[in-house]
UniProtKB/Swiss-Prot annotation:
Pathway: Purine metabolism; IMP biosynthesis via de novo pathway; 5-amino-1-(5-phospho-D-ribosyl)imidazole-4-carboxamide from 5-amino-1-(5-phospho-D-ribosyl)imidazole-4-carboxylate: step 1/2
Protein name in the entry: Phosphoribosylaminoimidazole-succinocarboxamide synthase
Organism taxonomic ancestry: Bacteria, Pseudomonadati, Pseudomonadota, Alphaproteobacteria, Hyphomicrobiales
A biological-process GO annotation: cobalamin biosynthetic process
Superkingdom to which the source organism belongs: Bacteria
Keywords, sorted A to Z: ATP-binding, Ligase, Nucleotide-binding, Purine biosynthesis
Gene: purC
Record field: catalytic activity: 5-amino-1-(5-phospho-D-ribosyl)imidazole-4-carboxylate + L-aspartate + ATP = (2S)-2-[5-amino-1-(5-phospho-beta-D-ribosyl)imidazole-4-carboxamido]succinate + ADP + phosphate + 2 H(+)
Keyword Zinc-finger among record annotations: no
E.C. number(s) listed in UniProt: 6.3.2.6
Amino acid sequence: MNRRRRIYEGKAKILYEGPEPGTLIQFFKDDATAFNKKKHEVVDGKGVLNNRISEYIFEHLNRIGIPTHFIRRLNMREQLIKEVEIVPLEIVVRNIAAGSLAKRLGIEEGTVLPRSIIEFYYKADALDDPMVSEEHITAFGWASPQEIDDIMALSIRVNDFLTGLFLGVGIQLVDFKIECGRLWEGDMMRIVVADEISPDSCRLWDINTRDKLDKDRFRRDMGGLVEAYQEVARRLGIMNENEPPKPAGPVLVSSKPDGETRH
């Protein structure tokens, strides 16, 4: 595939001009970052795993009627996506106390929350992505009240789906982060799920051992990041069961595509 014009490069992905108007190519890098890139390493194979896991999840979201920017996977590291106007918010949905919530409120990590909690963070690396309220969001025009309602409704639906998906393979969904975008279709606009959903953006614990299968392994210098991501892919049926782990180049089962926060 010929390289197209680079549109944007973030901490873990690069966006290129797509083959058709209104499309982009999303490339997954091997960079692992934490604390808004204060900690950074290149981890061989991470981008391939995140691309494949995110594809699997977004395909399922599309199938059950949760709108996303995802069109199809192009290769091991790239996806074709719809171009959207990103809402400058990171939406964090929490089911179990962990990370900044546990520290901020003095709650023991692992405590099941009374109900799922949705938090908003303003996307601004220079400010360390500060937590904001709905009042901030509407006052500064980052999103309208109706858009906030739509984002929260999508977040709840995604949480319901992911909780069941991971529970079925012995994984507890502690929390996750998504981004949303405005998708313009003629004169009509709707809010869709964008960015990625992968072990980079979710906290995932083995339901029996509580082993961490997510980016906390990198944040906390635990090691075994790629092996943990491979385990998630294996349980979801993405990795070949008979293939031993190879951190530098995981072997993935191909499929036919259907028609960083401080959290």
